Amino acid sequence: MSMEKLDLAVKNGIVVLGGGRYRIGIGVKDGKVALLAPEEMMPEAKETIDAKGNYVLPGIVDSEAHPGCYVPFDYDMKTESKAAACAGITTWGIQAPTTRLGTKPFKEVVSKSDVVSFNKTFPSGKEVINSVSHVDAYLTYMLETDEQAHEIPQYVEEHGVTSYKLYLQTRGMKGMADDDDTNWPSRRAGLGTGIDDGTVFLVMEQIAYIGYPGIVHIHPENWEIARIFEERLRAAGRTDFGAWTDRSPDFLEAQHIRAYSYLANQTPGHVPLYLQHCTTKLSFEEVLKARAEGLEVYAQTGPPWLWAEPEYGWRINVPLRRRENIDALWRALADGIVDVVGSDHVVGWEPSSYAEMYNPKIWDCRTGFSRVELFLPVLLSEGVNKNRISIERLVQVSCENPAKTSGLWGQKGSLLPGFDADMVIIDVNREVKVGKEHINTRSGWSIMEGHTFNGWPIKTILRGKVTAEWADDSPGMRPVGEPRGSYLPRKLRPKNEVVNAGSPARIAVTDRWEKSDFDRPGFSKETLRYTEIKNT
């Protein structure tokens, strides 16, 4: 019996799944993968794409992005979702507080009274995604108040939101006045109240109660202690970019992982924990300890920390790390200690340009830079092409695992029949020295500029339709067509319905991870230099 004509056939490619690579064709019908088959056995298709012998991956599921952080959500999504499509992204995990979901008027600096229920802001956020986005997107709410924590079951049922972030940098700010300068950076990013451990515990209780795919995200970085290091560095006259790394040394990240892993394990039901931008060897040791104690914990990192050293010149949170941590991070990604890669994309300021943003004195430099365009070039050039990870491992950490941890497995993250027909075709041998013509974000600049990367996306397909491509006459990837992204609600379901990403590696703690490489347990070399500095 002959099969109905396909909408799209992708041929002459090597299809990559987490378990292997296959010379096989992909058939698409009604936006879904209809079949994987030898090309000679595929039905006729209305349209055919020739992959030209390149790898065909599932579309990237980028689990952390912050459009709307510093400018109105709809304004940011119009440009940044195009940049995401050009980077091979088909699904974006947008993380936002209630003040940054498109409600009007937009307030550049928020106050406590602006922090309201997500019931009031969700409709505008959903409408923005459905009307202007070039990628599909789901929401991770950044919670601040006890009231929001108590409303989690309602958010799950009515909004389809099952992931919740706790921005621990704002811990200790709950009692501060709106005009307290210490709280200004967070209020500039839309966080008006700050959190305390009581709110953290309430959120963990609620997520443990609702079950899969409910999950708690945390940003592990102890800014209360970072303040002390900043005072010492300033007193020592340090203004170089490496001072931002020394301000927030490795143990401040690891300490939060230990503390909040313990709290998660004490929560009735043992809430699953998702650790964003893990970057240090000490952090990986804490992840392994938490797993050994029975906690379901997932570790994420991002392209900037897999490639850029402080001397490349910028400041982000958590900071860029030095070479020994970058090498350890690649080992952790390969070993299964780190499960997911997410871009943490944000365009820091508006208007933004390299000239406006740059300042050689780190304390005067503006925080943040766009990151989504780093995603595949870093993983391919620094990872696959240097034999640090396999192409299958790239699919696991950037497609499969983020779909599983976010509750989208079965729809996103694979090219198995029944999944959305989201794909990115990559040329692993395309070598490019990055210039402005390769940057698609509205910032118009990147720390990638002037550096050469070997391996690039050349075509992005969302639900069977091309959304971006590197045409023969184009200097780089460019968006194609009108926005067709959709909001992705999630729902609760039994864990046995999915292949759980919760097989984070239960590997034995070998000599590689059982002790610190550094001179003093818990302190990196850069930290050690500043433990004795006194304020003048």
Q: What are these model-derived regions, one by one?
A:
Residues 13, 31, 53, 64, ...:
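Divalent metal-coordination and catalytic microenvironments
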Residues 39-56:
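Active-site metal-binding motif and surrounding structural segment of the metallo-beta-lactamase
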Residues 51-129:
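Metal-associated gating/positioning segment near the N- to mid-region
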Residues 63-75, 136-147, 189, 246-247:
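Active-site mouth loops of central-metabolism enzymes
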Residues 147-166, 170-341, 346, 360:
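Histidine/acidic residue-rich metal-binding segments in metalloenzymes
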